[in-house]
Amino acid sequence: MMGNQKLWGGRFEKGLEQWVEEFGASISFDYKLATFDIKASIAHVSMLGQQGIISKDEAELIKTGLEDIHRDILEEEIVFDSQDEDIHMTIERQLLAKIGPLAGKLHTARSRNDQVATDMHLYLKHILEALLEKLLQLRKVLVTLAEEHIETILPGYTHLQHAQPISFGHHLMAYYQMFTRDSERFKFNMKHTDMSPLGAAALAGTTFPIDRELTAQLLGFNELYHNSLDAVSDRDFIIEFLANASLLMMHMSRFCEEIILWTSYEYQFVSLSDSFSTGSSIMPQKKNPDMAELIRGKTGRVYGNLFSLLTVMKALPLAYNKDLQEDKEGLFDTAETILVAVDILAGMLSTMTVHKETMYRATQKDFSNATELADYLANKDMPFRQAHEIVGQLVLQASKEGIYLQDIPIKDFKAISPLIEEDIYDTLTSRAAVERRTSIGGTGFNQVSSQIALARKDLS
């Protein structure tokens, strides 16, 4: 390969026009695979030398050249040229300049099809390792915050209406469970990512006596693809990642939506650190939860990346097709988005101020204790449906009078049902309502403590 001559140019009488070439080039984004491409090439050439397909001296020269190129890339001494088409051609051109025609032996028993598939597996494995660590830290932040707020009480909502008072720690632990499931999904995703397609060649394997198990071992893969067609055609592991990322972003978006509400003037449940807020160019008083809004907004682009690749893959015949070039930008974008978003959310949570009294006061001027009264009557042998009807009438009456259940005089309670005693007022407090929810997984303080203890054990 001389100058910018294509790796595949021998069969053609003339080259592509520049604008067509630019349309087909992927170097503007697949340069992000450079480290992984060089790592895979070093493993491949080491195997070629070990198997006697090329001499060990030749393998060592090629390996040294690749290591030099990697250093040049890290030091930003290499300019990525769109005429190279992709990162593989860039590296091979650089290798040719460093060691001469011997560079051509690197591609022995290998195709760009298994080469790029290997790069993608290595890249995503790297991303998953980083993401799982970040999710672990986010979960630790949630557990620590939940432990601080086991006895902090706020309204629980259904339909965004006050439903029942709950522990703020309980609320936080709900998100801990979501992010734990996310972590489990990404761990399973790793199983399908931690596989080596290297050696599948274009689609049918190779006639050379390669050792695929050796290259898999050198690259740290746990398993081989056992069908060469599948090896170069498979993008399931990327789709799984994008689907899992969509679920993760959905969970973060839901949390951020609540944070946005909680920081509003109407709620004032929490205040975000200045480090995660911005202001207004015209309204001096504003402190906006922009980072939470951006996580909510960026969820849409992650969804889009998932559906984009699903659509690319839906009608592709085996094996490799140029359509598969479209697997990269969405993956890179999603990976970069979620890695930062997880850090942002962890940072917001670990630095935000929780206004306990405001949360508690929000449970005092509502009817979120109505279920307590219904349960109170049911515990005195009244059928729950009858109790529900009676309490509903009391809520209606109190609403008309501008009072709440705890404000109703005992004589009026007894007029509705003689089963109601003076102890009803203790039952109707928000704290009692929370403490009495002692079923497994409930919001009772002891149950929240149990959830946290289980989480601590899981995180250790």
Curated annotation (Swiss-Prot):
Gene3D superfamilies: Fumarase/aspartase (C-terminal domain) (1.10.40.30), Fumarase/aspartase (Central domain) (1.20.200.10), Fumarase/aspartase (N-terminal domain) (1.10.275.10)
Entry superkingdom: Bacteria
SUPFAM superfamilies: L-aspartase-like
Locations listed in the record: Cytoplasm
Enzyme class: lyase
GO molecular function: argininosuccinate lyase activity
Pathway: Amino-acid biosynthesis; L-arginine biosynthesis; L-arginine from L-ornithine and carbamoyl phosphate: step 3/3
Coiled-coil residue windows: none
One Pfam entry name: Lyase_1
PANTHER family documented for this protein: ARGININOSUCCINATE LYASE
Protein name as it appears in the record: Argininosuccinate lyase
Species the sequence originates in: Streptococcus uberis (strain ATCC BAA-854 / 0140J)
Lineage: Bacteria, Bacillati, Bacillota, Bacilli, Lactobacillales
Gene: argH
